[in-house]
Amino acid sequence: IDATSAITLEVNKFNRIIDSYSKTEKGTNMLNELKVDNSAIDISIKSILEYELNNDMIPENGIIITVTGSQLKYDALEKTEEFIEEQKIQVRFNNSGDEHKVSP
C-alpha cells in the first residue's frame, strides 16, 4: 500500500496477513496501533485506509495498492472497495499486473 508511508503486507492463501512492515516510523506506528497481523486482508486494508484518511496520510494523487505473486480474487476486497467509494479516495489497484481504479 503506497501512501505517504509505504506499507507491505504478506498474505497467506487464506487471505490472512502473516506479516506487515513499513520502512517509515509513521507506517510502523500505524501497524503497531492497528495490529493487522493474522487478520483478514479486506478488513486490514480498510483499517489502514481509514487510519491514513484520519491522519492525513493520503497524498493528493491518491494511493496505489499493489499485489505481487498470486492475484487476489475479484471480491476479496469488498469492504475496502465500499469504504473507498464512500470516502471518495483515489485508489489505483494493481492486482499482479491487472491495474484498475477503485475510486469513483
Give the residues covered by each predicted segment.
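Polar, acidic low-complexity tracts enriched in Ser/Thr/Gln/Glu with frequent Gly/Pro and Thr-Pro motifs
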Residues: I1-P104
